């Protein structure tokens, strides 16, 4: 019986090693492991007959059985390693990039030229210690006109057509209304810059739009003078346009006195770029400030005009057309 069982064990080893070597998938290899070395496998079935052997025969058969088990396990490990390596290599081959193929196009967004001007301007003023203030686009007549020294019968109202709403409110014609609301809530000293969209009943053409953007600044403190205003504007324009000549021309605005227009020498000619002036005492009084104690200055400019000058844009309507051929230039 011993020689018969020994022969069966050796035959099982030979058969198992051949089957394992022929396995071409990890799933098939696992099936063979269970078939030969599992609890109900072929090797276990042969070893269960050892109970009928004598005590002298069992050690010999046990040693042979261990050798067979170790040999089959070694074959399984070797084949598994080989199959796993082949599987990884196949995956790498399938994922190998063809460097001659064009990549996947991922378009990048760009900053709109108007947003770019607003960001640059705010960076300058924030660097000078100004706070960014926001306000309502739908305003009352009081905040848009009356508090800014422009009563209902004032001739300055003819300077700009206004969009009036059925409820008596209006679409703001400038961001100066932000300054009034801010001053009502805060005590001097004040240094704010107010960007925003404004509305006027202009005929749309190459240089005019019914909706555009303004940025206005306001400073209120004791002892502020026109010299402080000129210095602030000079620093700002140098940051935006470089060290170019500027000049101040006497002008009129109902909410500043004295008032001035600011011109910039650009490509050999003077361009009007800003309006400015010292805050009118009547504006101070409308928000409860004492003009005998405080003085202030204000200035403003159109964002679209700055964008058109800096980027050499010939038609303001291009800024609103959402034409990617145009916007991709910035």
Curated annotation (Swiss-Prot):
Keywords: Aminoacyl-tRNA synthetase, ATP-binding, Cytoplasm, Ligase, Magnesium, Metal-binding, Nucleotide-binding, Protein biosynthesis. Binds 2 magnesium ions per tetramer. Gene3D superfamilies: Bira Bifunctional Protein, Domain 2. The keyword ATP-binding applies. It is an enzyme of class 6 (ligase). GO terms for cellular component: cytoplasm. InterPro entries: aa-tRNA-synth_II (IPR006195), aa-tRNA-synth_II/BPL/LPL (IPR045864), Phe-tRNA-synth_IIc_asu (IPR004529), Phe-tRNA_ligase_II_N (IPR004188), Phe_tRNA_ligase_alpha1_bac (IPR022911), Phenylalanyl-tRNA_Synthase (IPR002319), tRNA-bd_arm (IPR010978). One of its GO terms (biological process) is phenylalanyl-tRNA aminoacylation. Its main location: cytoplasm. Its cofactor is Mg(2+). CDD domains: PheRS_alpha_core (cd00496). It is found in: Cytoplasm. Its EC number is 6.1.1.20. It holds the Pfam family Phe_tRNA-synt_N. It catalyses: tRNA(Phe) + L-phenylalanine + ATP = L-phenylalanyl-tRNA(Phe) + AMP + diphosphate + H(+). It comes from the Bacteria. GO terms for molecular function: ATP binding; magnesium ion binding; phenylalanine-tRNA ligase activity; tRNA binding. Mg(2+) binds at residue 257. Tetramer of two alpha and two beta subunits. Belongs to the class-II aminoacyl-tRNA synthetase family. Phe-tRNA synthetase alpha subunit type 1 subfamily. PANTHER family: PHENYLALANINE--TRNA LIGASE, MITOCHONDRIAL, PHENYLALANYL-TRNA SYNTHETASE. This is Phenylalanine--tRNA ligase alpha subunit. It comes from Nostoc sp. (strain PCC 7120 / SAG 25.82 / UTEX 2576).
């Amino acid at each position: 019986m011993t020689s018969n069982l020994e022969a069966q064990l050796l035959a099982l080893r030979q058969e198992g090693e051949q089957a394992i070597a022929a396995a071409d998938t990890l799933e098939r290899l696992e099936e063979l492991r269970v078939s030969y070395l599992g609890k109900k496998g072929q090797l276990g079935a042969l070893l269960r007959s050892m109970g009928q052997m004598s005590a002298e025969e069992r050690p010999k058969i046990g040693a042979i059985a261990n050798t067979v088990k170790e040999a089959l396990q070694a074959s399984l490990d070797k084949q598994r390693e080989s199959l796993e390596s082949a599987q990884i290599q196949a995956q790498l081959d399938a994922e190998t990039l063809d460097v001659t193929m064009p990549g996947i196009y991922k378009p990048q967004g760009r900053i709109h030229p108007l947003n770019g001007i607003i960001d640059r301007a705010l960076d300058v003023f924030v660097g000078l210690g100004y706070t960014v203030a926001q306000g309502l686009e739908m305003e009352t007549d009081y905040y848009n006109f009356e508090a800014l020294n422009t009563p209902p019968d004032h001739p300055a109202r003819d300077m700009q057509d206004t969009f009036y709403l059925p409820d008596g409110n209006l679409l703001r014609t400038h961001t100066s209304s932000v300054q009034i609301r801010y001053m009502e809530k805060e005590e001097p000293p004040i240094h704010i810059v107010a960007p925003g969209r404004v509305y006027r009943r202009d005929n749309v053409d190459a240089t005019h739009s019914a909706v555009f953007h303004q940025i206005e600044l306001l400073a209120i403190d004791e002892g502020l003078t026109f010299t402080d205003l000129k210095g602030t504007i000079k620093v700002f324009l140098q940051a935006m346009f470089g060290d170019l000549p500027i000049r101040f021309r006497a002008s009129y605005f109902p909410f500043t006195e004295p008032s001035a227009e600011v011109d910039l020498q650009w490509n050999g000619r003077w361009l009007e770029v800003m309006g400015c002036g010292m805050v009118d005492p009547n504006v101070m009084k409308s928000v409860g400030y004492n003009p005998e104690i405080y003085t202030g200055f204000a200035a403003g400019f159109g964002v679209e005009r700055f964008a058109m000058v800096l980027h050499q844009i010939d038609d303001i309507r291009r800024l609103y057309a959402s034409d990617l051929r145009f916007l991709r230039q910035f």
